[in-house]
Design a protein with these regions (language model features):
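Charged, amphipathic alpha-helical linker segments immediately N-terminal to NTP-binding catalytic cores
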Residues: 3-38
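P-loop/Walker A NTP-binding module and the surrounding RecA-like catalytic core of P-loop NTPases
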Residues: 9, 19, 29, 51-281
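Pre-Walker A adenine-sensing motif
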Residues: 40-51
Length: 281
């Protein structure tokens, strides 16, 4: 109160105030970075168990109005996994698509901020970026920004040339524009898979998914399901009737009810686990 801060015994203080109070009480406070405890714990984790094949994690990026959301919606609505009663909750940060007993995990969060955090912490939560470019508009500033983020994170890129149903669509022009950004189509002698699609009619989307599965298979992605869980928080908040909730992407190990998780300098106990369809695990 003397410092102009009103707080109860159950509230947290900011670091500066906590250090000031500690000093006034005759002790020495040692400030730490927000993620320091988390990083030290991760350093102490050794990967346990056999590394086995895992699902690919996909982020869909692109310039505004190039059809990213429409493409995601079409894939969601056409997949076997999403035909269950009640559909899919639109606010979640991730969901799975199942096709012929094979799965893909899509991250539906703002891609740019996610990649910045990945670079800062030295971790990739995405394996493949699907870059959406409108066939009637071409490469735009956010397209270039998305390309740079993907390259900086060392992520595989698959291009979806969208809106091929439009009269003004020019697929070859798009390939030429992308070549200037050092993304050269495979049929132009490069190594980037580019698939013409229409998020409105669904044309080309089966081929796009097949291409993603092929790229993922070549990457030979693996993880262990044993030992403590490590991963990424995609989004978090407070939900009425449930309290604090978070969408997690587990990259190694297994997470169980009653486990404790550490995020930054905060710890919480897992009270319940649900899948992307909001069903208890």
């Amino acid at each position: 109160m003397n410092n102009g801060i009103m707080a109860t015994v159950n509230q947290s203080l900011d670091q500066e105030t906590a250090v000031l109070i500690t000093t006034e009480l005759g002790h020495v406070g040692n400030p730490i970075q927000e993620n320091e405890a988390e990083e030290k714990m991760l350093e102490g984790f050794a990967q346990e168990g056999e590394q086995i094949a895992r699902d690919a994690i996909i982020s869909v990026l692109g310039h505004v109005d190039h059809g990213k959301t429409s493409l995601l919606d079409y894939i969601r609505n056409s997949s076997v996994a999403d035909k269950e009663e009640g559909g899919i909750t639109q606010s979640i940060g991730a969901y799975q698509v199942s096709i012929e007993d094979k799965n893909l995990t899509f991250i539906d969060t703002p891609g740019h901020a996610a990649f910045s955090k990945m670079r800062a912490r030295g971790a990739n939560s995405t394996d493949i970026v699907v870059l959406v470019v409108a066939a009637d508009d071409g490469v735009q500033p956010q397209t270039v920004e998305a390309i740079n983020h993907a390259k900086a994170a060392g992520v595989q890129i698959v291009v979806a040339i969208n809106k091929i149903d439009k009269p003004e669509a020019d697929v070859d022009k798009i390939k030429g524009d992308l070549a200037k950004e050092e993304l050269v189509a495979e049929d132009w002698g490069g190594d980037i898979q580019m698939v013409p699609v229409s998020a409105q009619s669904g044309e080309g989307i089966p081929e796009l998914l097949e291409t993603i599965f092929l790229v993922a298979e070549i990457m030979d992605l693996k993880a262990s399901f044993e030992g403590p869980a490590t991963g990424v928080v995609l989004e978090s908040g407070v939900k009425r009737g449930e309290g604090a909730v978070a969408t997690l992407l587990i990259q190694q190990g297994s997470l169980n009810t009653s486990d404790f998780i550490l995020v930054g300098d905060q710890t919480r106990k897992i009270r319940a686990l649900k899948d992307f369809n909001d069903k208890p695990i």
